[in-house]
Amino acid sequence: MLKRGSIVLSIWSGINFLISSLILTIVVFHIGNSPLLEMVFEKSEIASLDAMVITSLNTLTILYNSYAVALSVLVWFVIRLCLSKGQKWAFWVLLITIGFVEIFAFIASAPLGNARWQVNIILSALYIVGIGLSGYSIFKGDKK
């Protein structure tokens, strides 16, 4: 069960890494603006926004997604090097850190009509299954 939990959490890390990297690429290389703009506003509303508003949102998008990429890499290393070996501290670190991120992902998107709900649900489900399998294995003694 520990191996399965580690795999599911690694999938969480990989999806988070890929989505955040894609968004960073789009915004940093000026391929487009923050995807949040199109999720929340109509094209006519975006056209009427001041350029500084769009730049500010893009800046926050770059900041958020750069942290998300870094967190995903750190999570992957903790899973691979520590959790998969049954180290309890790794379980608690991942439980608190990823749990914090998942809770605030819902809180952050709530005022915007839960614009990212599809992604939030998938990532939260992977987190709950992965951390649940890992925790059960570590604390019930089934470290396979």
Could you say what each language-model-derived stretch is?
Residues 1-144:
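Topology signature of small-to-medium multi-pass alpha-helical membrane proteins
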